[in-house]
């Protein structure tokens, strides 16, 4: 899709990968960038506004773990103001296997609920125009970091959800693809808890291997947005953007 003159909602658009991606999106000239984030960061919002004064950047506080009804209410406020939204980016995520319920709530349920909520406004069966969902998942959805099985499983679940809704596009009019970053230099990976403390040095060990910067990831994210391939499974690793071919071992046949 062409980002210029589009309306974009970015959940967690002020995080590590999120903020650099917001910067790259703003440079591409959307009409509106609506940032939904749990933590308010006025300085970051001001920076985004200054980066391209032609873009209207708006912030709303949002915790993806709220009930579905609250998410729908917030989206109604946004749609009432913008009338149309072209792209929803779901980017909320935590990495802490000591917080099992919250990891699942943020990394998986939050993605499902926000996507489900926007269907009220996009689903062509309800007279909607359709739209595009970009879900930030992880390479751990391909192969887990086994020391953080809860995080890895939550990202695998988000990836599975995304590939499923992509296949429903002919019914709903809503397309989807997944963004799967490799190990990226963010606060998230500098220190985190393994499951049951099976490996206290997991973050340190992980960072001994090659990583990528948030800017590299963000620039490739924008390329994936522009490619706009329904059902694509994008790997953003070591500064590269690659489409993954998923190996099929079983098919429901329906």
From Swiss-Prot:
Keywords assigned: NAD, Oxidoreductase
Enzyme class at the top of the EC tree: oxidoreductase
Biological process, per Gene Ontology: alcohol metabolic process
Record-level GO cellular component terms: cytoplasm
The reaction(s) this protein catalyses: a primary alcohol + NAD(+) = an aldehyde + NADH + H(+); a secondary alcohol + NAD(+) = a ketone + NADH + H(+)
Pfam families: adh_short
Binding, NAD(+): 10-33
Active site: 151
GO MF annotation terms: alcohol dehydrogenase (NAD+) activity
InterPro entries, per the entry: ADH_Drosophila-type (IPR002425), NAD(P)-bd_dom_sf (IPR036291), Sc_DH/Rdtase_CS (IPR020904), SDR_fam (IPR002347)
EC number(s) reported in the record: 1.1.1.1
CDD domains assigned: ADH_SDR_c_like (cd05323)
Keyword Oxidoreductase: yes
Residues that bind substrate: 138
Family that this chain belongs to: Belongs to the short-chain dehydrogenases/reductases (SDR) family.
Oligomeric and partner information: Homodimer.
Protein name: Alcohol dehydrogenase
Source lineage: Eukaryota, Metazoa, Ecdysozoa, Arthropoda, Hexapoda
Designated gene of the protein: Adh
């Amino acid at each position: 899709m062409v980002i210029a003159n589009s309306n974009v909602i970015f959940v967690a658009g002020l995080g590590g990968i999120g903020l650099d991606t917001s910067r790259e999106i703003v440079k591409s000239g959307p009409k509106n960038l609506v940032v939904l984030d749990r933590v308010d960061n006025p300085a970051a919002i001001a920076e985004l506004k200054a980066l391209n004064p032609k873009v209207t950047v708006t912030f709303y506080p949002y915790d993806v773990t709220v009930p579905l009804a609250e998410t729908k209410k917030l989206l109604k406020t946004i749609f009432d103001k913008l009338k149309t939204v072209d792209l929803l980016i779901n980017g909320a995520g935590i990495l802490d296997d000591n917080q099992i319920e919250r990891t699942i709530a943020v990394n998986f349920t939050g993605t499902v609920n926000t996507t489900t909520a926007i269907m009220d406004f996009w689903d062509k069966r309800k007279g909607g125009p359709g739209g595009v969902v970009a879900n930030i998942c992880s390479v751990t959805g391909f192969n887990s970091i086994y020391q953080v099985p809860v995080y890895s499983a939550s990202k695998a679940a988000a990836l599975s959800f995304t590939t499923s809704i992509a296949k429903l596009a002919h019914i709903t009019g809503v397309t989807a693809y997944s963004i799967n970053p490799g190990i990226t230099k963010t606060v998230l990976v500098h220190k985190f808890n393994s499951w049951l403390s099976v490996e206290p040095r997991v973050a340190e060990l992980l960072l001994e291997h090659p990583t990528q910067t948030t800017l590299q990831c963000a620039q490739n994210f924008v390329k994936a947005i522009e490619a706009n391939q329904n059902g694509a499974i994008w790997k953003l690793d070591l500064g590269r953007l690659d489409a993954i071919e998923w190996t099929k071992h079983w098919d429901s046949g329906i």
